[in-house]
Amino acid sequence: MKILVDGIRPNLFVLVETDLWPNCVDALKHRGVPAVLVNGRISPGSFARLRRLAPFLRPLYQSLDMVFAQSLEDRERYRGLGVRPECVQALGNLKFDSILKNPAASELSRLGESSGISGDRLVWIGGSTHEGEEEALLEIHTHLRERHRDLLLVLAPRRIERASQLVELCREHGCSVGRRSLGETAQGKSVYLLDTLGELSAFYHLADAAFIGGILVPFGGHNPLEAVACLKPTFWGPHLFNFREIESSLLQAGCGQKVDTYSELHTALAACLRSETIQAKMKTSAQRFLSTHTGCSRQIARQLVGRFFSA
């Protein structure tokens, strides 16, 4: 690390989240290079362990010039480990900014045309699904179509190499299916298989509701923010242990719903799809959440430039 720092001679070194390397910070300190931690977070369990080592770690944390923590709780934990109180702020989670990618209306129009999904068709999407989830989603879809005959399920598996297997599964459930990768459309189909890469976020914009996969089976889940950022009613299961803090924020804001079973998912989806009031309420909650939780990247950049790069 000393060789790297000497070779680059940085004006500022930025560490991210939990990547706090003692040797790196020590090398920076001895060369007069400011060290800043952005999007910092410390889980309660990690804090308990680190606090037992506080006498040894205090010089490390005191060496940090600035810390931008994700939450007020994280801010207090950093202070408890030795970061100078005036050097740590809680500005929010950078990940909230990273998911704001709103495609242009013309792009969404082209996507709707190429996929055959019209604006007046009721659509729900299963995003980043895993093996064991799709069969249950297809059963739910079959029941939902008893009330909404033209309802479309966009099925986006986490592993697109499972596409052929999923086509057979759809047919076993009596569902006609179109594949995105083959240039097929959703017209006349009850399921549209999104077996391509990089399009899931855009398809959330075409949906009326979204389920986030990897959560009703114990995989840890995928980030629900992507669907929430599209202002869609978003549902997930109990195993979202990879995104607990984000989950807590979303539930508190009322712009997502946690379900514990497929039966609960069916009930929640049925209520959402038949009620424009529920959809509008969750959309408003999502808008309010995004307005209060985004923008920290701009604030951090402004402070870094003002302190370390101003003339």
For the regions a language model picked out, list residue spans one by one.
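Nucleotide-activated sugar donor-binding and catalytic core shared by glycosyltransferases
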Residues: M1-A311
